[in-house]
Structures are given as structure tokens and as C-alpha cells.
Amino acid sequence: MPSLHIFYGGTFDPVHVGHLAIARAAHAALQAPIALIPSADPPHRPTPGSSSMDRLRMLQLAVSKEPGLSADPRELRRAARQNRPSYTVDTLTEVRSELGPKTSIIWLLGADAFVNLSNWKDWQMLPELTHLVVANRPGITLQTQLPPKMATVFNHRWVQDPATLRKTPHGHLWLLNQHPNPSSASKVRAAISAAAHWEADLTPEVAQYIRTHGLYGIHDIN
């Protein structure tokens, strides 16, 4: 079977059970290992609520018992080395250089991130570097929420059979239909801030890390 390399990027601030559900579903559907890549402070979103090293450590804890999943710190290392923002297109250019022009590469992302892809640096270049696997998310309808300029670039690239992704190195999109999980990082952070119940959206290891390190203002909660 031709090799397939899957990368799942995100802020993971913090990593929650919804992220893990998407990664598990992709791993099961595509039968390939998945490297989860925490982003550096993203240029197109507000600064994360925890440090990059906290986010990496939480991600490592979350995937430590997940077969086929691993944490990849390359984007954090590159941002620290170059002292500038880190972009997905840079990460994929680096990965493509490492793996060569004929290797099948997938960038996994949620539908909520995909519909905002036109805010990303050089987003039109992504199909020349990778396939995109888009996981459905609650409240997102791709047919109606995709901006026209994105529809022009992507609509002819969708495939129905995921086996196509192994046969070509880049350029296709496939919809990962999984049971959408309503968890979100913003929901977790808001729940911590409001002293509401939040642990159920996280693995026990990540929840304990947040408590131990006082992230998201938890030590301010009485």
C-alpha cells in the first residue's frame, strides 16, 4: 500500500476531546499515522491563552495513549528559530521538501477552519503541496458557507473515494464524515473562567496539567 502522511495542525489551546475525535476518525478511515502540529502564536488569530510549550505538553499528554497519533513540534521550533510568525504553507513546504514530490501528504482540518482558509497566507498554494481532508463540524455547511473565491479553487478537487488520496501526492479534497463533537477550545476556556464544569471536554491528563500549572486563570477561581 502506498505510504500516506497525515498532519493535523491547530492551536490546541487546549487540545480537547473534539480534536481527538477528528484525529481518531481520520486514522481509522485512512489507516495512516497522524502527526498533530501545534501552531506558533497564529498570525490570523488572537494570541493563545497558554504558552506554546504548555500547548505542546498538553498535546503530548493527550496523544500519549492514542495509537497512531503523535505530537510534532516542528512549527514551534521553526518559529522560535526564525523569530517570526509560522504559517501552514511554510510547514507544508518543509514537509514536502523532506518527503519528496511523489509522497502523498494530507493536511487534516475541521470544517470551521476550512471555511476561513482564505485568511491564511498563500492559501491558494496548498493544493500544490498537499491533499486536504476536511472534518465536518457542528453548525458548518460547506455548500453554503464557502466563500466564492475558495469555491473557485476547491470545488473541482473534491473526491468521493479516499483511496484516491494515496494514488496522488496532492491536490484533492475529501470530506471526513464523523460524529461531530461539540467541544471547542473557546468553550473550555470560557467554562474555566466562569468556574463552570469543564473537565469532561478534556482528557484527565490535560485537565490535571491545567490545574497544576494554573492555566486560563484557574487559580483565580474560588
Swiss-Prot record:
InterPro entries referenced in this protein's UniProt entry, alphabetically: Cyt_trans-like (IPR004821), NadD/NMNAT (IPR005248), Rossmann-like_a/b/a_fold (IPR014729)
Top-level EC class as recorded in UniProt: transferase
HAMAP family: NaMN_adenylyltr (MF_00244)
A molecular function (GO) term: ATP binding
GO BP field: NAD biosynthetic process
Keywords from the named record: ATP-binding, NAD, Nucleotide-binding, Nucleotidyltransferase, Pyridine nucleotide biosynthesis, Transferase
Superkingdom classification of source: Bacteria
Pathway(s) this gene product operates in, as recorded in its UniProt entry: Cofactor biosynthesis; NAD(+) biosynthesis; deamido-NAD(+) from nicotinate D-ribonucleotide: step 1/1
Catalysed reactions, as listed in the record: nicotinate beta-D-ribonucleotide + ATP + H(+) = deamido-NAD(+) + diphosphate
Name under which the protein is recorded: Probable nicotinate-nucleotide adenylyltransferase
Any single Pfam family the record assigns to this protein: CTP_transf_like
Family: Belongs to the NadD family.
E.C. designation(s): 2.7.7.18
Signal sequence coordinates: none
PANTHER family tied to this protein: NICOTINATE-NUCLEOTIDE ADENYLYLTRANSFERASE-RELATED, PHOSPHOPANTETHEINE ADENYLYLTRANSFERASE
Functional note: Catalyzes the reversible adenylation of nicotinate mononucleotide (NaMN) to nicotinic acid adenine dinucleotide (NaAD).
